[in-house]
Swiss-Prot record:
Homodimer. This is Succinyl-diaminopimelate desuccinylase. One of its GO terms (molecular function) is zinc ion binding. The keyword Hydrolase applies. Its cofactor is Zn(2+); Co(2+). Zn(2+) 2 binds at D105, E140, H353. InterPro entries: Bact_exopeptidase_dim_dom, DapE_proteobac, Peptidase_M20, Peptidase_M20_dimer, Peptidase_M20A. Binds 2 Zn(2+) or Co(2+) ions per subunit. The keyword Metal-binding applies. Its EC number is 3.5.1.18. GO terms for biological process: diaminopimelate biosynthetic process; L-arginine biosynthetic process; lysine biosynthetic process via diaminopimelate. HAMAP family: DapE (MF_01690). The gene is dapE. Pathway: Amino-acid biosynthesis; L-lysine biosynthesis via DAP pathway; LL-2,6-diaminopimelate from (S)-tetrahydrodipicolinate (succinylase route): step 3/3. It comes from Orientia tsutsugamushi (strain Ikeda).
């Protein structure tokens, strides 16, 4: 039986590390010690210039397939501490819930992964293949010195990963309802529209950039970028700010500025979207400045038999038929696309990053069973599924 006590105890210990991105605050060393005691070979690597980020890669066993559990130990800030029912970095178990910053995103999944792996190794000494972990402390921030760098290092060492399970919170209503197999891209825009300053009583002597930028933004909002496809919803533009830096009520300002974001599917590249945006703006003005930055591009995982087998496994363990999805924000899954097939599967995402973040203990146990049975499925020739 997979130990409920172990899952909860590991989660409580992980929450106690105030690992606000990109500082792991000792969490990487804690996980390293756990893995070493279990017989893993573990490498801890630090990357970065102005600051160093700790990452670990550990493996147990040998040969193929290499089933990799991946995740991040860093969390977002707790926000207003006084609004929390319980201290955010001191996990509190109350009735059927555990509260704490990072419980959902994603220390709960890491505790479930560790518990599942330790139980599997203790009960199966004749499995074929390798079990590995890739854990970073740089996902919630810029993600420059975490998974991306670690995968490059792993590849240079000659390690091949055959299938990756990333424990991001993917489910919406019940554990088992959603498996992420890709992600949309994200591109940010900073638009400045230039007009001509003047007195509000003499608009014919000025050019109002506010009127121009409103027309531009309305044209974006009122039209579809695309219709989406089999795996992706339509690309979506959201205006996040509009500003003139003008508090004087009788002045038409010279500059209006807006920031907006497009979450986009694999129908477009970020370069194509930039041209679409420019063309739209130039229907109204040519006197503008546009800056853009693309943090991540859309991707769809390699649709290997591992992914379809995992989907069937989730259905069998949870009794819920999961849907493949590419919705939500960006994640480190993008970095795996050139190295292995990958699924993202974890806890419910409804409480991620929120005040009083919590998860249900039953959900942790269910998630742990899925991870355990994935190892049985992929590493044991005569696997038997656990339901407890």
């Amino acid at each position: 039986m997979i130990s409920k006590k172990l899952i909860i105890e590991l989660l409580k210990q992980l929450i106690s590390f105030k690992s606000v991105t990109p500082n792991d605050n000792g969490a990487i060393d804690f996980i390293t010690n756990l893995l070493v005691k279990q017989g893993f070979k573990v490498y801890v690597k630090e990357f970065g210039q102005e600051y160093k980020v700790k990452n670990l890669y550990g493996y147990f066993g040998n040969g193929q397939p290499n089933i990799c559990f991946a995740g991040h130990i860093d969390v977002v800030p707790a926000g207003f501490i006084e609004q929390w029912k319980y201290p955010p970095f001191c996990a509190t178990q109350y009735k059927d819930k555990i509260y704490g910053r990072g419980v959902v995103d994603m220390k709960g999944a890491i505790s479930a992964m560790l518990s599942a792996v330790f139980c599997f190794i203790d009960n199966n000494n004749d499995f074929n293949g390798t079990i590995s972990f890739l854990i970073t402390a740089d996902e919630e921030g810029e993600a420059l010195f975490g998974t991306k760098k670690m995968l490059e290092w792993i590849n240079k060492q000659g390690h091949k990963i055959d299938f990756t399970i990333l424990g991001e919170p993917t489910c919406t209503d019940k554990i088992g309802d959603t498996i992420k197999i890709g992600r949309r891209g994200s591109i940010n825009f900073d638009l400045k529209v230039f007009g001509k300053q003047g007195h509000v009583a003499y608009p014919h002597l000025a050019i109002n950039p506010n009127h121009l930028i409103v027309k531009i933004l309305n044209s974006f909002i009122g039209s579809k970028i695309d219709e989406g496809n089999e795996f992706f919803a339509p690309s979506n533009l959201e205006v996040v700010s509009i500003d003139t830096n003008n508090n004087i009520t009788n002045i038409i300002p010279e500059i209006a500025q807006s920031k907006f974001n497009i979450r986009f599917n694999d129908i477009h590249t970020n370069e194509q979207l930039l041209e679409i945006v420019k063309k739209n703006i130039e229907q109204f003005t040519t006197n503008y400045d546009l800056q853009s930055s693309c943090r991540s591009r859309p991707f769809l995982a390699k649709m290997s038999p591992y992914i379809f087998s995992f989907k069937e496994l989730v259905h069998k363990v949870t009794k819920i038929k999961p849907e493949f999805s590419t919705s939500g924000g960006t994640s480190d899954a993008y970095f795996f696309k050139d190295y292995s097939p990958i699924v993202e599967f974890g806890l419910l995402n409804t409480m991620a990053h929120k005040i009083n973040e919590y998860c249900l203990i039953n959900d942790l146990q269910t998630l742990c069973r899925v991870y355990y049975n994935a190892l049985c499925l992929f590493l044991m020739s005569n696997s038997k599924f656990r339901t407890n």
